[in-house]
A protein has these predicted regions:
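Active-site helix-to-loop segments that bind/position phosphate- or nucleotide-bearing substrates
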Residues: 14-240
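Short hydrophobic alpha-helical runs that function as membrane-insertion/retention elements
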Residues: 5-9
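N-terminal, positively charged regions that mediate nucleic acid binding
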Residues: 1
Length: 240
């Protein structure tokens, strides 16, 4: 509290996100702005358009409604999966996510599911750190993590999808979870994920003076108690 530090209760290596604790003097300004934009029909649609515009650079989406944008995104994702499958010579049928039966998925879908969960958890922590609500989504709805899914979708192509196909092109994996975790972590660092999330969130809600990056170190300090004792992270020295 004295150091204004966000505490996150998570599974090992951020595989799951259970809860968080925030210092009591944290400003609610960003949350109130998010609520204002969510409750205003025009502003709500504009936020959604800004999200989709990130994935369609150069395309004028000003006249498109939500269904049209969702349709365009669905087509884009289908083509992306097919392109990467061809590029990395990975067998691909379709995205087959089974939340209740992880083992029923083929290996490429397992890799995508695992990588996406890691991305969700880091985005969740970033959203809370910046004072927004993970539940108030503008494209997704009906979940306590709707906004997490909104934000994570901005970065999946480079953070989880491409690394997953690249990993699968290497052949058999003794520990697929470990391999995809390391690949996603490397992609997050290479693409400066937290800096992008911060910039995009402030741009989305037209907030000036966005911080250069998060000041709470939610990436550097996501460690278990055992890792804290041994001063290691992700199987190597904690020097990130």
């Amino acid at each position: 509290g004295d150091n204004q530090t966000l505490l996150v209760w998570s599974g090992e290596q951020m595989r799951t996100f259970y809860a968080s604790g925030m210092y009591e003097n944290k400003s609610s300004q960003n949350l109130l702005r998010q609520i204002d934009y969510f409750s205003n029909k025009h502003k709500h649609l504009e936020v959604a358009r800004r999200m989709y515009a990130n994935r369609f650079p150069g395309l004028d989406m000003s006249g498109m409604n939500m269904n049209q944008m969702r349709g365009a995104e669905g087509t884009r994702m289908k083509k992306l999966y097919q392109k990467l499958a061809s590029e990395y010579n990975v067998q691909w049928n379709n995205r087959n996510y089974k939340s209740q039966d992880f083992d029923a998925q083929d290996d490429i879908n397992k890799a995508l599911t695992y990588g996406n969960h890691l991305l969700y958890n880091v985005c969740h922590a970033a959203i809370i750190t910046l004072g927004f609500s993970p539940a108030i989504g503008f494209i997704h709805s009906g979940s306590m993590r709707s906004f997490v899914y909104d934000i994570a979708d901005l970065y999946k192509e480079f953070i989880t999808i491409t690394p997953a196909f690249r990993i699968m092109s290497d052949g058999y994996h003794v520990d697929l979870g470990s391999d995809i975790r390391q690949a996603v972590r490397a992609a997050m660092q290479k693409n400066k994920l937290l800096k992008c999330v911060t910039k995009d969130l402030y741009k989305m809600f037209e907030i000036d003076n966005a911080p250069e990056t998060l000041s709470t170190g939610i990436w550097d300090n996501v460690i278990t108690y055992q890792e804290f004792q041994s001063k290691t992270l992700w199987g190597q020295k904690n020097t990130i």
